[in-house]
Every structure is written in structure tokens, then in C-alpha cells.
Amino acid sequence: MPRVALFIPCYVDQLYPSVGMATARLLERLGCEVVFPEDQTCCGQPMANAGFADDAAPLARRYVEVFRSFDHVVCPSGSCTSMVRNHYDGLLPASAGLEKVKRSTFELCEFVVDVLGVKKLDGRYPHKVGLHQSCHGLRELGLGTPSELVAPPGSKVAGLLAGIEGLELVSLTRPDECCGFGGTFAVVEEAVSCLMGRDRIADHVKAGAEIVTGTDVSCLMHMDGLARRRRDPVAFRHVAEILAEATA
């Protein structure tokens, strides 16, 4: 039985705790022993993205201290996972602990497919679903194939969803376009961010999606707020919630 430490991002902890609980339930159903280290804090991504490396470094050190004893760390966020794997080198000196946590930290769907070896989940979810492929997971973790690459298309997240009975993945005009959130980008470039988000929502609505899902609560939150203001006929749910509900 794999022993898995949950790393829960700030958005999930503060605003969407149901996503963390769904992640734990799904992993337990797949035979994992799930633990939650209570000393964990933010991964430091907001500070690093804003250019405050000195403020991000203590949080990166804390992450290494908390999680270096675990062989598997699972996070329901592509962007936070990518922060650990791809950007801690610029904040911390090289060490065995740093290298270990980089190797052992996985996004949820990535862990299910690549580590547990699960390609298909037994479950049912009778809805039309649109998949939003967030930028960090797609382009920094390789959860899918970006359209700008001349390579066979594929998506680990879409593969898991497509195997669920009754779940229909809708076809989008632009399947991997950014939603416009981008953390501080949504604050400093609010107008552009909102226009990008509305474009993504319109693509999903036109395709007939009842529910939009993805690996990052931040992107889903951004689009959900825009959709509710315009009363667009679509809901937003993290992929962990859909997979946990489908396999219940």
C-alpha cells in the first residue's frame, strides 16, 4: 500500500476544502494510505511569481523540511506541483532533500496514471464535461500535449475522465488556451484577464459542456466568477471531485 502525503494548496485549504477531501477519498479508494502533515504551509508560488524570491525561499525550505521523509507527495494542483518541481532550484541551494521532494511530488492525475498505473477508473458520471487544461500542468508537467508542439495529442487527465461511464468529454475549438487567471496577472491586467476567461467559458458553453473541470482550483475559480456574473449555463468542479463522485 503506497503511503501518500497530501500537499494542499492555499486556494483549496481556504476556499475549496471539498477538493482536498475528494483527493483523499479517491487515493484511499485506489489503495493508498493517505496522511496530511499539519506543519505544511504555502509552497511560495505567489511570492515567487511576483518577484519576491527572498520571501518565497523560507516557504520552499519549509516544504522540503515537511515532505522530505515521504516517497510520494500528491497535490491537487498542477501549478503548485510545478512550483516545487521546476522552480525551487532558483530559491534553494542544491541538497539531497530538495532533489528528493522534487522527484516525489506529483499532481493528482499524474500520480494516478504514472505511479499507480491506473489508466481507467470504474465509475459513472452522466454529464457533458469540458476539460480546461491549465498552463502549468500542460506545459511544465506534461499532463497533456500542447497544440503548439508537433506531437501526437494526449492528456492524462482526459484519459481518466474518458474512461468514466456516461461522461462525455466535449470537443473544444481551442482545447489548451489559457483562461487568463495567471495569479497576479488577474490583478494587474484585470481587463485582459477577464476577456480571456470569457473566451474560454464561451468555448465550453458552445461545445455543450454542463460542467467544466480541471486540475487547478485557481483557474476554475476565475472562470466560475465570470460565468456566475453573466449567468452562463455551466458549472465548475475540480477533477478530484468528479473522479471521487464517479467512483463512490
Regions found by a protein language model. Give the residues of each.
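Iron-sulfur cluster-binding electron-transfer modules in prokaryotic oxidoreductases
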Residues: 1-248
